[in-house]
Each structure stands twice: as structure tokens, then as C-alpha cells.
């Protein structure tokens, strides 16, 4: 099993909140922008629910805005977000506060602004306050008159620098909170964290009163959705009949991006659902045909041609089935034919669709009842990667669900600056399932193996949103079940043929029970709960190996393609030991003796006996060379 180890990607420096403010407040202060002529207005408005007000003159133009605000929180799941809206309808983030950013009961912010510190001469219309479980008092509004120096390239450069500084400061706040509260994830600066508010809102399909909890700053570790620390893991979680860890990325010992295709970027769009569906389909095609097909399908076609009413801005719940129906009934062409363009103003370009390359799914299954962990684990293990995501606290973001794990006492968290090991007292975490998602909204720059994947614990599985399984076979032009690869790569006698029933092109000697891990000769079949059958100890021979001494072996030996076992001494098979020579494998007895032999030859395998080598079969065992094997006895014998 893979040990639960996550690499936290930035150093966490413990600071008190007051100390933190002293260091990072300058990038949130309008007064820090030199050259501004400012105007301060007294407001003294109190808000305990969502509301808007209009403090601006009809002809007013501003280049910056900050607020003096007092926030009194009523619970830890509070949210405050204040937006400036201009007369064209554009929204700018003035401030946002949630527990990971500000965890004091009383928060006092003076001359505070975020995006609104640098505005390119806008006409302000209103200020909107979104509030949950808190009371907000806006005392003063400070605005800056237009500044002729902040235009063109200068404005863009200063805006990008401000985004960078603010993102670093907010990530540091979150990391201090995470360290104080023993959270298992790390915040940092990514392209998503530096997006403007409207873009970030669109990418995450977020409501104005949505609480990200810092998701937009996630760069590694296990993110939490909901109030995980409110109670221990349920009995259903801790007594699950399913295996503790399962991950489609590494099934059968394959490398990264073999079963799962590479990480894609949805840009500034809300195409997460389409990227999720395409990601599932590409991966299921690999898993169904049991090989890497290197498919790259068109999210653009699925978005604009499936009938979704406004794909760029977000998919309504009523439209959710439409792209799945399109995948089944029409199919999706390649990215090369219909490439992704990050634009809100587009339509279905049917002339781009190459009908000779449409990839289809057989059907899909929409999990519509209240999901529980065990049901999701069953679908994932037995059906492959799924479309799911995060649907909680005003966020609705689809991803590809590829695996899960269960947190256990003793699991190690490596943070670069220290190691945190899950302790016995971490009762609120032990037994909880974390889910592994392939994402399309985060631009990672760390080159860590987990880049592009998000690990999430949910308070309850209903927060995973709409859950879909795409059903095989995946229909690809020019491919049939005869193209499914049927192979034994570990030499245990079990064969792997991917997801689905045993294909007719498997050789007649292939057993009906599929190999659960074709990279491990010690593991046999996989049951519905994800547990592997344990086989007697064995060794896979993949390269040339020589047994030159007189010795015995208790191991089952699987000689696979590229493997050569040469026996030049006396080797005695004991216990459950036997030799299986697979397609492309070679067994050579070169002047040595193989005693008590139990040998299975597979068509395409080779046996060579030379220099008076001898094979003495075990009692009751007969040497059989099926049609298609090569047996070359230059000098020697088989008894």
C-alpha cells in the first residue's frame, strides 16, 4: 500500500494574527499607493444579511477604493464579502473574510481594499455586502481620484504586482491558521489565486456569498470541505468493508499519465464539467482497451454543441445531463479538430467536428440519491474514474474522481520544515476518507507528482455534488473488443484485460478470473471491495537472471517478456514453487539441473537445454509444450 505522504510546498512560519497584520497590511492599503488624491466619506452602515447601497455620485469616476470595516463573527463558518459594482455591471473585490483568513471574534480593518486598490478610472455604481453568520459595520469609504500615471502598461504592471503581493499575504494567513489548527493542507500562490474576482467566481461556479475556505489558494495536502472537526468519523466510515486505499493513476504499476491523461487547463471558463467528462472518457478508454491510447478529446465541442444554455458562465442543474447525453448519442471529436478557445462568445462550430473520429460512451449512470461513502467506493473501484467534485458553501466545481484513501494513526505528513504524524489524539481525522480528484482549474508550478490533483475530505458525501459514472465500452472508430490488450505482465498466470468482461480475443488458456494487480506476482484477483487475493510468494523475472549455485527456491517464478532465467547450477523447487514461462520469456538450463520441476509453458515462450542440462519433473507433473512454444534441446534431457 502507498503510505499517506503529502509534501507541503511552502514553509509555514508561526505568527500571531496581530504580528501578521503588521507585516502584510501594506498591500491592502489605499494609502500605500503614492500619488493618489483621496476622498473619505462617513457611512456607518450595519449589515447582518446580504444587501447593497449606492454611495456614489452619478458622474463620479474613481481609480481606487478602500473601507474602514468592523466585523463581528457569530460562528466559525462565517463569511463576509464586499464587492464594488461599476455601471457596466463589472464586480471588484473590496474584501473577503472567512475563518481561514481572519479567525478572531472581532475584526477591525482600516483603509482595507483588495482589487479595488487599483482601478482604471471606473464609474462606480454600488457596494454589495454578502454576509453569513456575522455582523458588518462599514464606517468609512475612501476613494481615489483618477490618476493619469496609472494607465496602459504601468497600470497592468502595478496590478499584477499587487495581485502577487496580496495572494502571498492571504496564503500566509491561511497557512498560519492551518498550522494552528493542525490542518493537513497548504496554501500558496497559483494562477487561480491571482485571478480577478469575476474570473475566479466563474471558474469555481461560485455564488457571491460562496465560501471557498481557501480552496483558491490550495497547492497541496488534504483540503477540508465542511466542519470536519465537529464530530468523529461515523461508524460507517470506520467500519467500511472497502479497501483503505484505491487510486486509478497507478493501477497495475503503470506510470503517471498512463491510465489518466495529462492535466488540462480550463482557462478562465466555467468548463469544469466538460473537462471532467472528457477526462473520465479519455481515462476509461485507456482502461477499457487496457492500453494508453493517448486520446485528447474536445471539451469545446462538448461545451458548445451539447445544448447547454450558457456553458461559459456555468451549467445549471437542469442542463447537467445534456453533455452526458451528447457523449452517448453523438460522441466527441479530437482536440486537434475542435481546439479549446477561452472565450465567452462562441457557438457550436459543426464544421470543426470530424465525424470519422467521434468517441462515444455506451451509457452513463447519474447517482441521484443521497450518496454514501461505500456506494461511491463501489462505483469507483468497479467502474473506473467518475465525474464528481465540490458542491458546498456556494461552490460548484466538477472534477474527475480517481481514488481515495483513509487517514490512519501513524500516517506521515511531510511539510519540508517538520514532519507531522497522525497521533492517537487526532480522533476527528482518524478513519475519515479523503478523495483524490484530477482538476482543471489550478496551474501548478511546483512540479510535484501530485500537481493538478486535489485531495479532499468532506463532512458528508452530498458535498461532492452531482456524481456520474460513464459506462463502458467506450466506442472508438476502428476499435473493437478485439483491440483489448490481454496480458500477464507479472507471470502469475492471471491476466489483465482492463475494465469490462473478458474479451474473446484472450487466448484459450487465460483463466476467467482477472488479475487485480498485473505488476505484482504475489497478488491475484481483485474483489468488489478492492481487496487483492494474496498468492504464495513469487518473483517476476523481467531481465536476464542466472542461478549458478546449488540451491533451492520456495518461490513461484514468472518469466515474462524480456526475462531470461539461466540455470547453470542445481536448483530445486520446494513447497509451492513452480515456473511459468510467459510470452517472450526464456528458460535456459545450461549445464545445470532443475530438480522437482513444475513448469508451465505459454505459447510464445522458449525453453533451451544445452551443455547436458537436465530437468527432472516433480512427481505427478508432466512437461507439456503447447503449440506455439519453442523447445530447443541442444544437449540434455527432460525426465
Feature-to-residue mapping (PLM):
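Structured alpha-helical subdomains that flank or immediately precede key functional sites
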Residues: 155-270, 274-278, 284-297, 315-324, ...
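Boundary at the C-terminal end of the N-terminal hydrophobic targeting segment
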Residues: 17-22
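Membrane-associated feature with strongest affinity for ZDHHC
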Residues: 482-528
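Beta-sandwich interaction modules
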Residues: 43, 48-63, 71-154
Amino acid at each position: 500500500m502507498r503510505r499517506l505522504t503529502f509534501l507541503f510546498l511552502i514553509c509555514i512560519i508561526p505568527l500571531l494574527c496581530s504580528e501578521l497584520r503588521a507585516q502584510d497590511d501594506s498591500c491592502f492599503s489605499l494609502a500605500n499607493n503614492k500619488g493618489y488624491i483621496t476622498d473619505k466619506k462617513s457611512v456607518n452602515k450595519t449589515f447582518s444579511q446580504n444587501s447593497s447601497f449606492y454611495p456614489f455620485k452619478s458622474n463620479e469616476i474613481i481609480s481606487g477604493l478602500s473601507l474602514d470595516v468592523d466585523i463581528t463573527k457569530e460562528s466559525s463558518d462565517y463569511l463576509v464579502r464586499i464587492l464594488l459594482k461599476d455601471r457596466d455591471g463589472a464586480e471588484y473585490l473590496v474584501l473577503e473574510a472567512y475563518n481561514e483568513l481572519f479567525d478572531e471574534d472581532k475584526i477591525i480593518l482600516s483603509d482595507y481594499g483588495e482589487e479595488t486598490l487599483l482601478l482604471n478610472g471606473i464609474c462606480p455604481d454600488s457596494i454589495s455586502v454578502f454576509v453569513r453568520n456575522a455582523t458588518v459595520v462599514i464606517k468609512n469609504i475612501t476613494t481615489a481620484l483618477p490618476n493619469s500615471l496609472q494607465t496602459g502598461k504601468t497600470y497592468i504592471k502595478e496590478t499584477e504586482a499587487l495581485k502577487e503581493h496580496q495572494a502571498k499575504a492571504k496564503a500566509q494567513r491561511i497557512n498560519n491558521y492551518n498550522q494552528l489548527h493542525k490542518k493537513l493542507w497548504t496554501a500558496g500562490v497559483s494562477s487561480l489565486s491571482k485571478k480577478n474576482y469575476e474570473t475566479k467566481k466563474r471558474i469555481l461556479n461560485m455564488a457571491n456569498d460562496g465560501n471557498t475556505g481557501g480552496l483558491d489558494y490550495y497547492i497541496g495536502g488534504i483540503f477540508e470541505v465542511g466542519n470536519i472537526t465537529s464530530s468523529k468519523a461515523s461508524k460507517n466510515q470506520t467500519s467500511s468493508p472497502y479497501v483503505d486505499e484505491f487510486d486509478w493513476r497507478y493501477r497495475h504499476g503503470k506510470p503517471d499519465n498512463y491510465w489518466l491523461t495529462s492535466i488540462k487547463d480550463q482557462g478562465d471558463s466555467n468548463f469544469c464539467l466538460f473537462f471532467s467528462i472528457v477526462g473520465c472518457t479519455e481515462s476509461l478508454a485507456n482502461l477499457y482497451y487496457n492500453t494508453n491510447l493517448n486520446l485528447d478529446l474536445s471539451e469545446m465541442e462538448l461545451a458548445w454543441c451539447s445544448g447547454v444554455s450558457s456553458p461559459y458562465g456555468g451549467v445549471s442543474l437542469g442542463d447537467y445531463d445534456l453533455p452526458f447525453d451528447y457523449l452517448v448519442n453523438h460522441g466527441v471529436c479530437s482536440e486537434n479538430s475542435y481546439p479549446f478557445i477561452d472565450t465567452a462568445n462562441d457557438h457550436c462550430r459543426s464544421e470543426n467536428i470530424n465525424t470519422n473520429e467521434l468517441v462515444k460512451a455506451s451509457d452513463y449512470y447519474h447517482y441521484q440519491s443521497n450518496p454514501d461513502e461505500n456506494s461511491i467506493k463501489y462505483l469507483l473501484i468497479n467502474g473506473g474514474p467518475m465525474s464528481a467534485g465540490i458542491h458546498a458553501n456556494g461552490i460548484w466545481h466538477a472534477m474527475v474522481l480517481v481514488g481515495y484513501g483513509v487517514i490512519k494513526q501513524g500516517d506521515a505528513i511531510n511539510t519540508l520544515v517538520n514532519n507531522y504524524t497522525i497521533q492517537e489524539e487526532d480522533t476527528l481525522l482518524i478513519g475519515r476518507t479523503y478523495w483524490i480528484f484530477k482538476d482543471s482549474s489550478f496551474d501548478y508550478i511546483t512540479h510535484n507528482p501530485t500537481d493538478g490533483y486535489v485531495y479532499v475530505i468532506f463532512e458528508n458525501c452530498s458535498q461532492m455534488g452531482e456524481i456520474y459514472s460513464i459506462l463502458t465500452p467506450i466506442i472508438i472508430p476502428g476499435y473493437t473488443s478485439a483491440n483489448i490488450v490481454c496480458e500477464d505482465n507479472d507471470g502469475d498466470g492471471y491476466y489483465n484485460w482492463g475494465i469490462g468482461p473478458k474479451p474473446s480475443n484472450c487466448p484459450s488458456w487465460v483463466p476467467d478470473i482477472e488479475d487485480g494487480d498485473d505488476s505484482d506476482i504475489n497478488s491475484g484477483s481483485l474483489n468488489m471491495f478492492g481487496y487483492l487475493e494474496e498468492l504464495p510468494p513469487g518473483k517476476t523475472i523481467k531481465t536476464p537472471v542466472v542461478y549458478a549455485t546449488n540451491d533451492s527456491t520456495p518461490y513461484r517464478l514468472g518469466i515474462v517478456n524480456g526475462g531470461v532465467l539461466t540455470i547453470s547450477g542445481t536448483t530445486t523447487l520446494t513447497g509451492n514453487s513452480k515456473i511459468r514461462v510467459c510470452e517472450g520469456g526464456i528458460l535456459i538450463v545450461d549445464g545445470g539441473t532443475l530438480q522437482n520441476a513444475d513448469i508451465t509453458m505459454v505459447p510464445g515462450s522458449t525453453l533451451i537445454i544445452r551443455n547436458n542440462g537436465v530437468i527432472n519433473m516433480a512427481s505427478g507433473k508432466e512437461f507439456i509444450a503447447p503449440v506455439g512454444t519453442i523447445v530447443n534441446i541442444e544437449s540434455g534431457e527432460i525426465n
